[in-house]
Swiss-Prot record:
GO cellular component: cytoplasm
Tagged with keyword Metal-binding: yes
Domain of life: Bacteria
Entry protein name: Ferrochelatase
Catalytic reaction list: heme b + 2 H(+) = protoporphyrin IX + Fe(2+)
Main location: cytoplasm
One of the record's GO molecular function terms: metal ion binding
Length: 319
């Protein structure tokens, strides 16, 4: 009987209760690969002060979307769908970078099943050292500290995979179907922002985002589209334009029909359910945009699961 292979899905994670918001934020702001706050030895203390101040506001956001992030349940559903697609020689596990189940939890579960072969598959389509890079480095750190004997391969990007592009285009078509005349719709790809300094230092994130947009628009054809960046925080220069600025610009130009496309997210969480569905929707309405919609997230889209399965099979066959 062939030896089983573990597929470890790497994701950001999110608080599973209101009480978990502050410790989740602390884990996030303590990671120097995503944000550097002062000298390394001071970052934990500065991060704690920042999180204590930010937590009440962020808790309010989560209280409006059910009191927690759905990202764990959705990622576990993706893992289950992928395992069913791959068949009996594969087992799928989830590792969250900033919450539970942690990387240590996931590796312990893999070890309990007696599996030594692991494919670590990042669920961030577009590589950045702040996201995929941080998750992979955390995995390598845990493996080193544990002295665990796993044979690990890494899938760290899939921004141009044909099945990912097809899945994204299909969801956008679902979104466009909510409008009576697609020629009047302004489509806004909204990607998670990143400090401009990352790009200046050679991070490929922006080039990956631009290529995804190009490939998707090749499929969609004649639709007016724009690219913007959401979720920036702090006083440093971030990628531009921001999603808020783009909405304001389109409204000023007379836009009445707007479809938001969450681009760097493969499942629903705070950025889609609160930022887009509540915050940006309210802003758009106040600016006179009459029909504001969002294309559905990929979640367990069969095309997206096919993409993940293909990435796994390609990794296995290349060894």
């Amino acid at each position: 009987m062939p030896e089983k292979t573990a597929v470890l899905l790497l994701q950001m994670g999110g608080p599973d209760s209101i009480e978990a918001v502050e410790p989740f934020l602390l884990n996030l702001f303590s990671d120097r690969e995503i944000i550097k706050i002062g000298p390394a030895f001071l970052q934990p203390f500065i991060a704690r002060r920042i999180c204590r101040k930010r937590a009440p506001k962020v808790e309010g956001y989560y209280s409006q979307i059910g009191g927690k992030s759905p990202i764990r349940e959705l990622t576990e559903a993706q893992a289950q769908a992928l395992e069913e697609k791959l068949g009996g020689n594969f087992r799928c596990f989830v590792a969250m970078r900033y919450w539970k189940p942690t990387t240590i939890d996931a590796l312990a579960a893999i070890k309990r099943e007696g599996i030594s072969r692991v494919i670590a598959l990042s669920l961030y389509p577009h590589y950045s050292r702040a996201t995929t890079g941080s998750s992979i480095n955390e995995l390598k750190r845990v493996l080193g500290e544990a002295g665990a004997r796993f044979e690990v391969s890494y899938v760290d990007r899939f921004y141009d995979h044909p099945l990912y592009i097809a899945a994204l285009a299909a969801k956008i078509e679902e979104g466009l179907a909510q409008f009576s005349n697609r020629s009047e719709v302004e489509l806004v790809f909204s990607a998670h922002s990143l400090p401009q300094s990352f790009i200046d230092e050679g991070d490929p994130y922006l080039s990956h985002i631009l290529e995804t947009v190009r490939l998707v628009m090749e499929r969609l054809g004649n639709v007016n589209y724009h690219l913007a960046f959401q979720s920036r925080a702090g006083p440093v220069k971030w990628l531009e334009p921001s999603t808020e600025e783009m909405i304001q610009k389109l409204a000023k130009g007379g836009c009445k029909e707007l479809l938001m496309v969450p681009l760097s997210f493969v499942s629903d969480h705070i950025e889609t359910l609160y930022e887009i569905d509540i915050q940006y929707a309210e802003e758009a309405k106040g600016l006179g945009i009459e029909h504001f919609r969002r294309s559905p997230s990929l979640n367990t889209s069969p095309l997206f699961i096919d993409c993940l399965a293909n990435l796994v099979h390609k990794t296995v066959s290349s060894e």
